Swiss-Prot record:
InterPro entries: DNA_Rcmb_RecR, Hlx-hairpin-Hlx_DNA-bd_motif, Rcmb_RecR, Rcmb_RecR_Znf, TOPRIM_dom, TOPRIM_RecR
TM stretches of this protein: none
Function comment: May play a role in DNA repair. It seems to be involved in an RecBC-independent recombinational process of DNA repair. It may act with RecF and RecO.
Protein name: Recombination protein RecR
Lineage: Bacteria, Bacillati, Cyanobacteriota, Cyanophyceae, Oscillatoriophycideae
Position of the signal peptide: none
Family annotation (NCBIfam families): recR
Organism name: Gloeothece citriformis (strain PCC 7424)
Family that this chain belongs to: Belongs to the RecR family.
Residue span, Toprim domain: 79-173
């Protein structure tokens, strides 16, 4: 149905997360319609990003330098550390503009079914970082999947001897109806409740 070069492009685009066959086909056809200069600019940007973006040596977040902007920022709170599964979580938390501490990216979650144990994650550097620096609080911000819960409990137990360990509350989304929420979400929402502050 497609010429071999177009079929290869569609196949490669399908490898991207969230891109199914129809979306890959639409993207490929869109790329072919664009001017050659624009397509070359896109291809060059992809290659440059792959070559130039690595991991911060301190927190393992994406960085074009040995240390990321967040770790280098002197205005960030050095005594609070937020532990996340991957860089997408850092980006999501940064968008809230609520958190002013530093991060530690694990690089995934413990998932025995996928062959991922604690040794494959950035857990040892995290324990070293917390034990060697004056970290007053570690916030575990890992999604509440089965693997995420396993990771949260494992990391929490390792860090407990060194500092205060908390986790983010999970609950209902804004505008969500209670009747449509699952039992686990409702239970977490109740567990994470806080006293109303009228000030």
């Amino acid at each position: 149905m497609f010429t071999p070069p177009l079929a290869r492009l569609i196949e490669q685009l399908q490898r991207l997360p969230g891109v199914g066959p129809k979306t890959a086909q639409r993207l490929a056809l869109h790329i072919l319609k664009r001017p050659e200069e624009e397509v070359n600019t896109l291809a060059k940007a992809i290659v440059e990003a792959k070559k130039q973006v690595g991991l911060c040596q301190v927190c393992f977040h994406l960085s074009a330098e040995s240390t990321c902007e967040i770790c280098r920022n002197p205005n960030r709170d050095n005594q609070t550390l937020c532990v996340v599964a991957d860089s997408r979580d850092v980006i999501a938390l940064e968008k809230t503009r609520e958190y002013q501490g530093k991060y530690h990216v694990l690089g995934g979650v413990i998932s025995p079914m996928d062959g991922i144990g604690p040794e494959q994650l950035n857990i040892s550097p995290l324990v070293r970082r917390v034990s060697q620096h004056q970290i007053k609080e570690v916030i575990l911000a890992i999604s509440p999947s089965v693997e995420g819960e396993t990771t949260t409990l494992y990391v929490g137990q390792l860090l407990k001897p060194f500092t205060k360990v908390t986790r983010i509350a999970f609950g209902l989304p804004m505008g969500g109806d209670l009747e449509y929420a699952d039992e686990v979400t409702l239970a977490r929402a109740l567990e994470g409740r806080r006293e109303l502050d009228y000030n």
